[in-house]
A protein has these predicted regions:
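Hydrophobic "anchor" residues on beta-strands that sit immediately upstream
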Residues: 18, 97, 116, 301-302
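Long, charged N-terminal accessory/stalk domains
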Residues: 125-126, 132-181, 185
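Walker B catalytic acidic pair
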Residues: 305-307
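Conserved lysine of the Walker
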Residues: 36
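Conserved NTPase motor "head" modules and their coupling/switch loops across ABC/AAA+ ATPases, GTPases
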Residues: 1-31, 45, 174-301, 310-314, ...
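Structural recognition of the conserved hydrophobic beta-strand(s) that form the central parallel beta-sheet
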Residues: 72, 328-335
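Nucleotide-state sensing region of NTPase/ATPase domains
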Residues: 47-133, 137, 142-149, 203-211, ...
Length: 361
C-alpha cells in the first residue's frame, strides 16, 4: 500500500497543496500548529471515511471557504486508484461526496481502499481513557479489514437510536411495548455480527501485541480480553426492558463493549505507570498494523504524528526499528533530533509552516 500523491484544497489550514510522496520514509518537520497533524489526518480520513479527531465534518473546511477537498492517488495490489473526498457546507447543512476512480461511493464503502495505522499522542487514551476510546480503536481497525463491517456498524447505530426513541415513547405512554419486537430482533442480529468480528480481531491482536510489548518492556506480559455483549442479546434486551424504560436508553449491546488491557495481570488503566501505558499503546498500534497486513495482504501506511518526542529512548528505539522495517511511513516531528542520521539519509524530508510544505533549509 502506497500513497503516491496527495492534493488538499481549502482543507483546514491548507489553502492548496499538491504533494508527491516517497515510497518509504517521509518526514515532515515544523513547529506546533503549522499543519503537521492536519496533513496526517487527511490520509486517515481516506482510510476511515471520517476524521478521527474532528467533532464536526464542517471543521475540516478552511476559513472563508464553502468546501474542502482531499484527493489522492494510491497504489495497491498492483493497481492505481484515484480517491476524492469532498466536504461542503451550505447554510446549516454539511454534506460529503466520495469518489473512487471517478465513481461516487457511499462513506461506509470507502474504508479498505486505503489501509493506514495512525499513531499520535492522544492515543494514550487507549489505555487511560474510557471504553469509548477502545471501541473506536477496534472500529477504526475493523472497517479497514472486514468487508461490510462499516455498513453493519452504521445500521446498528441507526437501529439503536430508533430503539432508544421508542423506549422514551413507551415510557410516556405514546407507544405499546410490542413496537419494540422488530427493533430488538434486528439489534440482536447486528450486535452479534459486530461482537463476533471484534472477538475474532482481539484473538488475533492479542499475541501480536503481547510479543511486541514483551520485547519493548523487557519481559512484561500484556494481556487483552474482549468484554463484549452477552451471547443471547435478544434475551438480555427482554430481561432488562424495565431498566431500559426507566433510563430511556439501551443498556446492553456492543455499544457498551470494552477491551480489557492488563500488564502482568494488573489492570493497566488503574495501576500501570505512564511509561507502562505508553508501552502498551505502542504495542497495540504496531499490532494493529500487523493485523491489517495479515487480513488485507497489504502493509498499511504508517502515520506517526509527533510521537517520538513522547517516548523514552527504549520505546523510541523499538518504534524506529519498526519504521525501518515498514513499507510507507509518514511521520511528523518538531525537529529531526529523534531520528538516527542513517534513517534520515533514506527519507524524503520536508518542512511545514503555516499550511505550506517546502524543502527544508
Amino acid at each position: 500500500m502506497r500513497l503516491v500523491s496527495l492534493t488538499l484544497r481549502n482543507y483546514r489550514n491548507y489553502a492548496r497543496l499538491q504533494l508527491e510522496l516517497g515510497p518509504r520514509l517521509n518526514v515532515f518537520l515544523g513547529r506546533n500548529a503549522q499543519g503537521k497533524t492536519n496533513l496526517l489526518e487527511s490520509v486517515a480520513i481516506l482510510a476511515l471515511s471520517s476524521s478521527p479527531r474532528a467533532r464536526r465534518e464542517s471543521d475540516l473546511i478552511g476559513p472563508v471557504a464553502a468546501d474542502a477537498l482531499i484527493e489522492a492517488v494510491v497504489e495497491s495490489g498492483g493497481r492505481r486508484v484515484e480517491l476524492s473526498f469532498r466536504v461542503s457546507q451550505e447554510s446549516e447543512r454539511t454534506g460529503k461526496t466520495i469518489r473512487v476512480d471517478g465513481v461516487a461511493r457511499r462513506a461506509v464503502d470507502l474504508p479498505g481502499e486505503v489501509q493506514a495505522t495512525l499513531f499520535w499522542p492522544d492515543d494514550l487514551s487507549l489505555v487511560k481513557g474510557g471504553p469509548e476510546y477502545r471501541r473506536r480503536f477496534l472500529n477504526e481497525m475493523l472497517v479497514q479489514v472486514v468487508k461490510g463491517y462499516g455498513r453493519t456498524l452504521a445500521r446498528y447505530r441507526r437501529v439503536l437510536d430508533q430503539r432508544n426513541h421508542l423506549l422514551k415513547r413507551i415510557a410516556a405512554g405514546q407507544e405499546g411495548r410490542d413496537s419494540l419486537a422488530v427493533w430488538d430482533a434486528e439489534l440482536a442480529n447486528l450486535g452479534g455480527a459486530l461482537a463476533s468480528a471484534r472477538a475474532l480481531a482481539i484473538a488475533d491482536l492479542a499475541p501480536l501485541a503481547a510479543a511486541g510489548h514483551a520485547a519493548i518492556s523487557g519481559g512484561e506480559v500484556l494481556g487483552l480480553s474482549y468484554l463484549g455483549p452477552p451471547a443471547d442479546l435478544a434475551t438480555v434486551l427482554a430481561a432488562t426492558l424495565e431498566e431500559d424504560l426507566r433510563r430511556g436508553t439501551t443498556g446492553a449491546g456492543p455499544h457498551r463493549d470494552d477491551l480489557s488491557i492488563a500488564i502482568d495481570g494488573v489492570d493497566a488503566r488503574s495501576f500501570a505507570s505512564q511509561g507502562q501505558q505508553r508501552t502498551a499503546v505502542v504495542s497495540l498500534k504496531l499490532a494493529e498494523s500487523d493485523l491489517i497486513e495479515s487480513r488485507s495482504g497489504e502493509r498499511p501506511i504508517l502515520l506517526l504524528d509527533d510521537v517520538l518526542s513522547e517516548l523514552d529512548p527504549r520505546r523510541r528505539e523499538a518504534l524506529l526499528a519498526r519504521v525501518g522495517e515498514a513499507g510507507q511511513v509518514i511521520v511528523t516531528s518538531v525537529e529531526a533530533d529523534p531520528f538516527p542520521a542513517a534513517l534520515m539519509e533514506l527519507a524524503a524530508v520536508r518542512c511545514i509552516s503555516g499550511g505550506r510544505v517546502e524543502s527544508c533549509g
